[in-house]
Amino acid sequence: MKRRPAFTLIELIFVIILIGVLGAVALPKFKGMRDNAKTTSELSTAASVQTAIDACHGEWVINEGTFACGFDIDPADPAQFDASSGYPITLGSSDTTPFDKILKNGKSVKWIKGADGYYRGPASNGGVKPANPDIAGKPDSNDYWEYNSTTGILQLVDN
């Protein structure tokens, strides 16, 4: 009777243990990658909004105070455009959807307009859990975005 080459039971157990250890080390890294992707996407969207705001202001400067932005904003309406600074007050349809004219899903974001005229909206609707300790400049569910229509600045406010 010929002996056929095969793996011993010890070798198989060793391979199973090795796969288990590699899986235990790799899984937490993949979880962090998902949160990083969501955070990067949110920061990219915020940069796009800031670019649109800056483009409107740039057109106002080039046209010497005449507002001619490509968005559907009425320059004569003081609720939509700040004639003194050249920044759009809203790039949306209402106080609760201030960016729906420039964001594809702008209506689904829950923004509010404060008494101070600032728009505030939640950061990290994608479900990125709060970091402990909080990392400045990285949006999580404790933070919020703030748009100042006087200065045209959209910024992340860390809580």
Show which residues each predicted segment covers.
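Short catalytic/ligand-gating loop segments at beta-alpha or beta-beta junctions
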Residues: 113-120
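Short, exposed beta-strand/loop patches in secreted or surface proteins that constitute
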Residues: 109-113, 144-147
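Long, low-complexity, serine/threonine/proline-rich intrinsically disordered regulatory regions
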Residues: 98-102, 106-111
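N-terminal single-pass transmembrane signal-anchor helix
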Residues: 2-34
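Membrane-proximal N-terminal amphipathic helix
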Residues: 35-63
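Short, glycine/small-hydrophobic-rich surface segments
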Residues: 53-98
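Short, surface-exposed interaction loops/tails
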Residues: 120-159
